Amino acid sequence: EKNPELGVEIRLLQVRAQIMFPPIVSRPTFFLRKKPRQIFSLEDYKAQGALSEKYYGIILDCIKKRKNIIVAGATGSGKTTFLNAILKKLSEINPEHRLVILEDLPELQCSSDDVQYMTTSGNRTTSVTMQDLVFISMRLSPQRILIGEVRDKSAYDVLKAWNTGHPGGFCTIHADGCH
């Protein structure tokens, strides 16, 4: 009852697990989420009719001009999958950029030459928060700071980092739309 939930990553299997026990659920629950084996490209989205030529061009322009990109959507809508496609394009356009990727659990996949992955520690006694990672990442001389999912207090820190010499960041947020 003291710790009724646990989120873990099983790296060998490339699986993320969320385990919950009463009292936060009515019965023990175990949820698995597997990392995709294939990373879709923006061109794949275009070919499937999920991305118009107009928005494809806008995204390419944003990558090239180091504009920040926020991918918004509901749970399970494909935010991370789409962000991985944007990362794939970034790796093609600017493979030399020093990237720092911050996540709660590793989900983003990037083939750039110079990438540093950092994850929060979900440990209840000693923890490294997303706010901490944003602060630390700014000391690593990144050209871009990319965040798997921005929520809560870390949103302010991310915006601050992007606007203090680290433009061209990407992130996802939970939202019903862009307004």
Predicted feature descriptions by range:
Residues 75:
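Anionic-ligand-binding alpha/beta catalytic cores of soluble enzymes and soluble regulatory domains
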Residues 78:
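Conserved glycine(s) of the Walker
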Residues 66-72, 81, 85-179:
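Switch/coupling sub-region of P-loop NTPases
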